[in-house]
Amino acid sequence: MDQWDWEKIIRPDQRNYTYLKTVVRAVYLAVRRIAAQVTKKYPALTFDLPREITFVSTKELEKMYPALTPRERENAFTKTYRAVFVYQIGWPLANKQPHDGRAADYDDWKLNGDILLWHEPLDCALEISSMGIRVNAAVLEKQLRQKKELDKLSKP
């Protein structure tokens, strides 16, 4: 697996869900364009990607599939919608557990998520991107408090 990170400087007024959705849609459009180029060059390779990506929060997934594990929820939803952005990963859900573990000092757990695509040959959702808007000072402290890692505030 190859993992590439990129950062984008944003204004404080862009720290919101609307802006995050705009970036997710742009990333997904790039994926669709690349898939089309691959299929054009290699016709045997086809991709069943919907025109639009579907957004779902971890809370919504938990309400829809309360008896399933987080991974099973992602698979069930992604199998139906094919391209999904699961957002708000990190805070505990109604069952008192987070959907998935996230570092407290990286992304804002209210403004993060994973792009998942359904992969028919493996019959499962594949995560192609994990992304989010970085923490600010207030969010950093709140998330460190949640994970009982406030000592990190005193470390450079």
Model-identified regions with their sequence ranges:
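Residue-level marker of positions within ordered structural domains that often coincide
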Residues: 11, 32, 91
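Inter-helical turn/loop segments and adjacent helix faces that build the functional surface
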Residues: 10-18
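A translation/RNA-centric and nucleic-acid-associated enzymatic feature enriched
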Residues: 61-156
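Long, well-ordered alpha-helical scaffolding segments within enzyme catalytic domains
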Residues: 18-35
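Alpha-helical scaffold segments that mediate packing/assembly in large oligomeric complexes
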Residues: 32-68
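Low-complexity, flexible helical/coil segments
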Residues: 19-22, 40-45, 120-124, 152-155
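Residues forming anionic-ligand binding surfaces in small-molecule and nucleic-acid pockets
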Residues: 1-11
